């Protein structure tokens, strides 16, 4: 029997160690039995604003059997969660990943998910339930189209200070948040890194390490003028004799001008193209320029480092809690893990495998929709259109006014409801 190369054996053992060390804390593809793992909250049921979830692949997909959960009612609150074995990311990388598709061409609503800690009554999970991490896209109007990354530290929710744009089309996208033991993070969309940095700089979790010295003052001899007047520059001879305005040589006395009645005619004046305003010497670089003065940075006496700044010690639930004006957001392939490579692989095996087919299905659905809209549009002859225009000419302004008033009222109502919901988040 041939002996195996010791180096080959070492490589196999190393690969096995890597595989074993990678841990999947929670993974949900919403296959059979998903309802036993997820608890629908009773939040907002009493005031009849709780939305229903639908188990579906959506109106277009790359695989009709690959289903997720989708919001199904407009102007509703949604809350659902699943429990997993309590997990701490101390000394580990934390990976939080999921996919979401906004089939409704979302104009105001969330597409984010949450990780929660400690014990939570899942039947009461809602907007007021404390969470550890909130991550994912949020869209509202033209101003809000970003990826939320909110971390809870010492009972306070802290928003990321960097703007991370989210996807706004009607296709599936994968959102990934990676948090490492060195307090660095990455945000990926569709397996492409969109933002990376440090918890210290990109969130206000702790006071700043360094601050400007409040007792420092700019030295009296500090010259911060970058340019100065040229001391060798002199005013040209006769410069002050150039008038600001001159008579218009093209002007002519009107034919009906009467000197006796109107007085002596004088040509109007026009701006003098040779006049350059008050003379000032030209500017030159200041040889004594020291730059803009800045107070020196000193250690912040308020800063106290926390080596476990990145740690969430009792993660136990994953959930969706959001408000939607228009329903149709579909969540799928939820993952909590300590292995970024596994997360990338899962994204490619799900979203990556089906994205082209999904795009083709979407394009076909759009084509059919446009054809149906074209069929529904009334076809009228030119004569009929002219007759109708004559009949309705007198009513156009009234109808237009009523239509505008109705539209204005609807928009005002929608804006008020949207603002109220966002205030609640």
From Swiss-Prot:
InterPro entries: Calret/calnex, Calret/calnex_CS, Calreticulin, Calreticulin/calnexin_P_dom_sf, ConA-like_dom_sf. The keyword Signal applies. Residues 213-235, 241-255, 348-378, 399-412 have a biased composition (Basic and acidic residues). One of its GO terms (biological process) is response to endoplasmic reticulum stress. Induction: Induced by cadmium. Gene3D superfamilies: 2.60.120.200, Calreticulin/calnexin, P domain. It holds the Pfam family Calreticulin. Residues 213-281, 348-425 are annotated as: Disordered. A motif (Prevents secretion from ER) lies at residues 422-425. One of its GO terms (cellular component) is nucleus. The modification Phosphoserine is found at residues 381, 397. Molecular calcium-binding chaperone promoting folding, oligomeric assembly and quality control in the ER via the calreticulin/calnexin cycle. This lectin may interact transiently with almost all of the monoglucosylated glycoproteins that are synthesized in the ER. Keywords: Calcium, Chaperone, Disulfide bond, Endoplasmic reticulum, Glycoprotein, Lectin, Metal-binding, Phosphoprotein, Repeat, Signal, Zinc. It comes from Arabidopsis thaliana (Mouse-ear cress). It is found in: Endoplasmic reticulum lumen. Can be divided into a N-terminal globular domain, a proline-rich P-domain forming an elongated arm-like structure and a C-terminal acidic domain. The P-domain binds one molecule of calcium with high affinity, whereas the acidic C-domain binds multiple calcium ions with low affinity. The interaction with glycans occurs through a binding site in the globular lectin domain. GO terms for molecular function: calcium ion binding; carbohydrate binding; unfolded protein binding. It comes from the Eukaryota. Residues 1-22 form the signal peptide. Residues 194-259 are annotated as: 4 X approximate repeats. Disulfide bonds join 108-140. Residues 263-301 are annotated as: 3 X approximate repeats. This is Calreticulin-1. Residues 379-398 have a biased composition (Acidic residues). An alpha-D-glucoside binds at residues 112, 114, 131, 138, 321. Sequence repeats lie at residues 194-205, 213-224, 230-241, 248-259, 263-273, 277-287, 291-301. Glycans are attached at residues 59, 154, 399.
């Amino acid at each position: 029997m041939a002996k195996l190369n010791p180096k080959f054996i070492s490589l196999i053992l190393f690969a096995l160690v890597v595989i074993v060390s990678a841990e999947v804390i929670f993974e949900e593809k919403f296959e059979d039995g998903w309802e036993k793992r997820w608890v629908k909250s009773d939040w907002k049921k009493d005031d009849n604003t709780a939305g229903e979830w639908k188990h579906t692949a959506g109106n277009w997909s790359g695989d009709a059997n690959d289903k997720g959960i989708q919001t199904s009612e407009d102007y509703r609150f949604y809350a659902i969660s699943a429990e997993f074995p309590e997990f701490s990311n101390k000394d580990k990388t934390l990976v939080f990943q999921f996919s979401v598709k906004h089939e409704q061409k979302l104009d105001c609503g969330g597409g984010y998910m949450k990780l929660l800690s400690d014990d939570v009554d899942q039947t009461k999970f809602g907007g007021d339930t404390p969470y550890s991490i909130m991550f994912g896209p949020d869209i509202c109007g033209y101003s809000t189209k970003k990826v939320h990354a909110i971390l809870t530290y010492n009972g306070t929710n802290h928003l990321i200070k960097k703007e991370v744009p989210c996807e706004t089309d009607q296709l599936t996208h994968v959102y990934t948040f990676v948090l490492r033991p060195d307090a660095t993070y990455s945000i990926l969309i569709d397996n492409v890194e969109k933002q990376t940095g440090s918890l210290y700089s990109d969130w206000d979790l702790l006071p700043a390490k360094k601050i400007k010295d409040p007792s420092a003052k700019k030295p009296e001899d500090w010259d911060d003028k970058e340019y100065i007047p040229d001391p060798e520059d002199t005013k040209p001879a006769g410069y002050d004799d150039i008038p600001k305005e001159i008579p218009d040589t093209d002007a002519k006395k009107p034919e009906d001008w009467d000197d006796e009645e109107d007085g002596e005619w004088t040509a109007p004046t026009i701006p003098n193209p040779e006049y350059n305003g008050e003379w000032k010497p030209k500017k030159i670089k200041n040889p004594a320029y020291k730059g803009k003065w800045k107070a020196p940075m000193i250690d912040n006496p308020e800063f106290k480092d926390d080596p476990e700044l990145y740690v969430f010690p009792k993660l136990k639930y994953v959930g969706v809690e959001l408000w939607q004006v228009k329903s149709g957001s579909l969540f799928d392939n939820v993952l909590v893990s300590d292995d970024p490579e596994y997360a990338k692989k899962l994204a490619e095996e799900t979203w990556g495998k089906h994205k082209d087919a999904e795009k083709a299905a979407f394009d076909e659905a759009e084509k059919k929709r446009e054809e149906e809209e074209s069929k529904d549009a009334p076809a009228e002859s030119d004569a009929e259109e002219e007759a109708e225009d004559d009949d309705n000419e007198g009513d156009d302004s009234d109808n237009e006014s009523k239509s505008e008033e109705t539209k204005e009222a609807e928009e005002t109502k929608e804006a008020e409801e949207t603002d109220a919901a966002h205030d609640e988040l």
